[in-house]
């Protein structure tokens, strides 16, 4: 491999894409887009970090896709597949997969540069995928006579569809009960989720697309010596990067949302620990009502923290009395809420407590972040060991 020749060929390919191929398909030639793509390619070839400001209308998505494709086609070093693309919006993830990459593949194949399409896959967290074992159990439990027909049809559709986001009319209740659990030790050879993970680990996809949460989660796993979420890779493209710090702050910290408390109460009722559920419902009532209100910027976080006094007394009692009797899921839910409440009622000086909008409800949620968050992001994401 001649490094200098490949570097030159990669840059020539970018010029060819933006000066010849895309204009032939009705797209305007934009000098700023070409310069941006060359700058991105330089960073990829040199293994550097590049912070690229792309104004509206420049065409940043094609700029980084062209640069990544050129870097892969003409490597100047060891390029580890896949190339990771992280965005903050589902709409952009779908657009990259369904619109941008198919068109780029089409024109490059028509020109003889590629012999097969650029392959990509969207990666998501476990809660977005169905667990075959839990789905079978749920279908056995459901009352066919009382179940909403659309919700029942959605459940049955999951027998053929792994990604639950692609199934309409699936209730939140059913979704929680059939998704892949956070602790998954499935040994089934025919498990669709495990087969999907194995496929993603193979050298099959040039691009793996994810949201910022999954990107940060992978970085945290690697920093803690845990099994990585993504295969080894040498190029990361962070689109909508202005939203990465907020995501990292949440991922590296602790949150307490009303939904977590309500789910715990519901689970206690399902396992017939009605007194414990009633105690928790009573002690968390004022907090839940507060979190249901839209977040006010000027209101101090102490207004919410004061409402944790009662739950901080109730939760340890529940833990002592029935903690060892709960199902694994119930135990994890109880421990998660208990640990969060302990943190928010502690006097740790190295933590920053604040409220943030809970986008799922329109209300607020409690957040705790380490005071050295900038250094932690730098260490796990930009300067890993």
What are these regions (language model features)?
Residues 50-52, 85, 208, 236:
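Hydrophobic positions in the central parallel beta-sheet of the AAA+
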Residues 64, 70, 91-94, 98-102, ...:
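Signature of the SF2 helicase/ATPase Hel1-core->accessory helical subdomain module
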Residues 337-385:
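Segments forming glycine/polar-rich beta-alpha architectures that bind adenosine-containing cofactors
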Residues 46-67:
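Walker A/P-loop
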Residues 45-46, 79-80, 202-205, 230-232, ...:
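Short loop/turn elements that form and flank the Walker-type P-loop nucleotide-binding site
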Residues 2-23, 28-31, 75-208, 212-213, ...:
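A substrate-engagement module of RecA-like helicase motors
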Residues 41-42, 61-78, 99-103:
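Walker A/P-loop NTP-binding motif
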Residues 27-44:
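N-terminal pre-P-loop "Q-motif" helix
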């Amino acid at each position: 491999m001649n490094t200098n020749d490949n570097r030159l060929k990669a840059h020539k390919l970018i010029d060819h894409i933006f000066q010849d191929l895309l204009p032939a398909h009705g797209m305007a030639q934009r000098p700023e887009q070409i310069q941006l793509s060359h700058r991105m390619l330089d960073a990829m070839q040199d293994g550097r970090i590049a912070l690229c400001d792309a104004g509206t209308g420049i065409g940043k998505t094609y700029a980084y896709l062209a640069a990544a494709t050129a870097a892969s086609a003409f490597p100047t070093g060891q390029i580890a597949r896949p190339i990771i693309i992280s965005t903050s919006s589902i709409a952009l993830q779908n657009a990259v997969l369904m619109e941008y990459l198919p068109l780029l593949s089409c024109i490059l194949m028509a020109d003889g540069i590629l012999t097969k399409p650029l392959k990509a896959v969207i990666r998501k967290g476990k809660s977005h995928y169905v667990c075959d074992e839990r789905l079978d159990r749920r279908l056995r439990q459901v009352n066919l006579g009382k179940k909403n027909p659309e919700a029942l049809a959605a459940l049955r559709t999951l027998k053929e569809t792994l990604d639950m986001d692609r199934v309409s009319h699936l209730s939140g209740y059913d979704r929680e009960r059939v998704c892949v659990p956070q602790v998954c030790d499935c040994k089934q050879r025919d498990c669709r989720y495990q087969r999907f993970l194995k496929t993603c680990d193979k050298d099959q996809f040039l691009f793996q697309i994810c949201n910022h949460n999954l990107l940060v989660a992978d970085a945290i796993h690697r920093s803690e010596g845990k099994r990585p979420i993504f295969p080894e890779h040498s190029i990361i493209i962070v689109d909508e990067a202005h939203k990465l710090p907020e995501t990292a702050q949440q991922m590296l910290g602790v949150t307490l949302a009303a939904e977590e408390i309500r789910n715990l109460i519901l689970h206690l009722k399902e396992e017939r620990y009605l007194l414990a559920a009633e105690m928790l419902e009573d002690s968390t009532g004022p907090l839940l009502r507060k979190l249901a209100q839209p977040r006010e910027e000027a209101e101090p976080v102490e207004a919410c923290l004061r409402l944790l006094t009662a739950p901080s007394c109730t939760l340890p009692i529940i833990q002592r009395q029935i903690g060892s009797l709960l199902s694994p899921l119930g135990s994890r839910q109880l421990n998660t809420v208990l640990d969060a409440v302990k943190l928010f009622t502690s006097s740790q000086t190295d933590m920053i407590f604040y409220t943030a909008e809970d986008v799922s409800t329109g209300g607020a949620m409690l957040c705790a972040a380490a005071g050295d968050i900038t250094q932690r992001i730098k260490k796990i994401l930009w300067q890993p060991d």
